[in-house]
């Protein structure tokens, strides 16, 4: 049965709670209304303490962590690999290659790949062995040799169940051949009763009679006496020798060096491996090192892209890495238009509300999709977080009504839950790394030829941050270079005081003109600035457009 097509529902880089919750909610909604696909909530970055609290509170698994939206090995439709075990004969591998039309066969032992047999492996070993005199047969099960030779078992008095030793073809004078025979060897002989008898008496353990030649009762008596076996085949001695050559186990034929990849490797990386490999293939191993697929050049010629739905953003600078190589199916957002382009027309829903989770919840209601308590709680969390429990200026009446509705479905006291959630979100550990803190919730904006980044950190106490001001300022210089922007702003927002302290590395005149604010002790106090999206970015953008 063909696996369902996967579609990843994913928020912006460094996801906040609304980004995480709307991805979970919308994936759940789509799985209910659109069959034939599986919608997977995903994220690009680490989870915040607030998001972890929400997931634990409602018993939900974290969204799948995706490092890049570039196509990876797991986006290919990998078939179950055809493989053999170490005791398989080279003959059987050759037959498998011919019947399945494949050029490389993995050798697997205890679920781990230990080698690969290629067409050239078989040809090279076969040609090399033809130059060796006498031929040697490696330990091979008697029944397997019978099958490979398509032989008739005339008699079998051998005590051993495996055959090994030198192989002699009766083409020399009999006295010469008898001088070479050792006890336990294999002989190939034609319609020559004296030779058959003499070879068995000398100690041949297995005699292969070619061209369907007759075997007398006298020969059978000696075979019994010597604990030997006699096989009869319909073809000539040379053909029998060729097949015996191919009876050796694949462990003596296979290459022990072979290219491997994982499901997380990008197809660009895999192409480099496959196209530079002698066998023009790579073998896929899972996280436990078990073989789970084979990739050939043909697989890499297909146009493979991850299918994604973007939520809570529509700007290329905020999108997960590799989004330009993905196929965007939908965009669900509540921010300004960011100029993200797509190859094909997409469903784009953008509404000026306080949270993407509000929009997702509305989809449930409009389409009559039942909402479980956990999903209602998840979406409620997204609204409470992104509106700071309705304190941000981006909050709309629709956000308030939807939050109250979701609280009823989730059977929660809205005010108590909101305070608990925001308290978790505003916790800042004393030993936190400044760079890690400032990158938790940062967004990059481009306006004309200028770009700037805005990080926002919620706090209930400005005094703690003031103590670490110098450490944060030093970190800002590094982050500005890391993000490749001209200005880096950090908003420390206090919902209780309904104000933000602004720390920055860049042109401070932008802030002075945008907010008519003065810098004090290296910081700007911006009263009433609560929302990055509505209170801060538009005013900075207005100054840039006016003066640049």
Curated annotation (Swiss-Prot):
Residues annotated as binding Mn(2+) 2: 18, 312, 334, 386
What molecular functions are annotated in GO for this chain? inorganic diphosphate phosphatase activity; metal ion binding
CC cofactor:
Mn(2+)
- Region annotation PPase part 1: residue ranges? 1-74
- Start and end of every CBS domain? 77-132, 254-311
State the compartments where it is located: Cytoplasm
Name of the protein in question: Probable manganese-dependent inorganic pyrophosphatase
Q: Which gene encodes it?
A: ppaC
């Amino acid at each position: 049965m063909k696996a369902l097509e996967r579609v990843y529902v994913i928020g912006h880089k460094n996801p906040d709670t609304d980004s995480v919750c709307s991805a979970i909610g919308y994936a759940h909604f789509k799985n209910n209304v659109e069959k034939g696909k599986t919608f997977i909530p995903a994220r690009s970055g680490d989870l915040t303490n607030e998001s972890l609290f929400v997931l634990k509170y409602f018993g939900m698994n974290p969204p799948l962590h995706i490092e890049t939206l570039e196509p990876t090995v797991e986006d290919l439709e990998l078939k179950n690999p055809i493989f053999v075990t170490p005791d398989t004969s080279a003959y059987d591998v050759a037959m498998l290659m011919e019947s399945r039309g494949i050029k490389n066969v993995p050798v697997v032992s205890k679920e781990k790949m230990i080698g690969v047999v290629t067409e050239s492996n078989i040809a090279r070993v076969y040609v090399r062995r033809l130059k060796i005199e006498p031929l040697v047969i490696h330990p091979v099960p008697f029944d397997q040799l019978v099958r490979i030779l398509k032989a008739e078992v005339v008699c079998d008095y051998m005590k051993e169940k495996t055959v090994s030793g030198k192989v002699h073809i009766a083409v020399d004078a009999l006295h010469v051949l008898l001088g070479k025979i050792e006890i336990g060897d294999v002989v190939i002989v034609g319609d020559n009763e004296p030779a058959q008898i003499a070879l068995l008496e000398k100690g041949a353990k297995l005699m292969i009679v070619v061209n369907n030649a007759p075997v007398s009762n006298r020969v059978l008596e000696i075979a019994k006496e010597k604990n030997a076996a006699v096989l009869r085949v319909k073809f000539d001695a040379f053909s029998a020798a060729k097949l015996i050559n191919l009876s050796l186990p694949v462990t003596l034929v296979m290459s022990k060096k072979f290219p491997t990849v994982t499901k997380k490797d990008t197809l660009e990386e895999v192409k480099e491996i496959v196209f530079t490999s002698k066998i023009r293939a790579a073998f896929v191993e899972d996280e436990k090192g078990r073989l789970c697929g084979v990739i050939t050049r043909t697989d890499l010629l297909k146009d493979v892209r991850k299918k994604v739905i973007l939520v809570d953003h529509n700007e290329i600078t905020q999108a997960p890495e590799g989004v330009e190589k993905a196929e965007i199916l939908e965009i669900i957002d509540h921010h300004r238009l960011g100029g993200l382009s797509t190859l094909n027309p997409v469903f784009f829903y953008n509404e000026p509300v306080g949270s993407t989770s509000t929009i997702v919840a509305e989809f449930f209601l409009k389409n009559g999709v039942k909402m479980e308590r956990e999903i209602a709680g998840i979406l409620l969390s997204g609204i409470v977080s992104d509106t700071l429990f309705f304190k941000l200026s981006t909050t709309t009446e629709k956000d308030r009504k939807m939050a109250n509705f979701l609280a009823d479905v989730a059977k929660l006291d809205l005010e108590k839950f909101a305070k608990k959630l925001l308290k978790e979100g505003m916790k800042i550990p004393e030993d936190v790394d400044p760079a890690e803190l400032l990158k938790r919730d940062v967004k990059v904006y481009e306006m004309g030829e200028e770009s700037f980044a805005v990080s926002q950190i919620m706090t209930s106490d400005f005094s703690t941050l003031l103590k670490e001001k110098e450490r944060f300022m030093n970190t800002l210089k590094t982050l500005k270079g890391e993000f490749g922007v001209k200005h880096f702003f950090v908003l420390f927002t206090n919902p209780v005081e309904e104000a933000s302290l602004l720390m920055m590395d860049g042109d401070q005149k932008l802030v002075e003109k945008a907010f008519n604010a003065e810098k004090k002790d290296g910081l700007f106090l911006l009263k009433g600035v609560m929302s990055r999206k509505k209170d801060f970015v538009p005013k900075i953008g207005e100054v840039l457009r006016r003066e640049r």
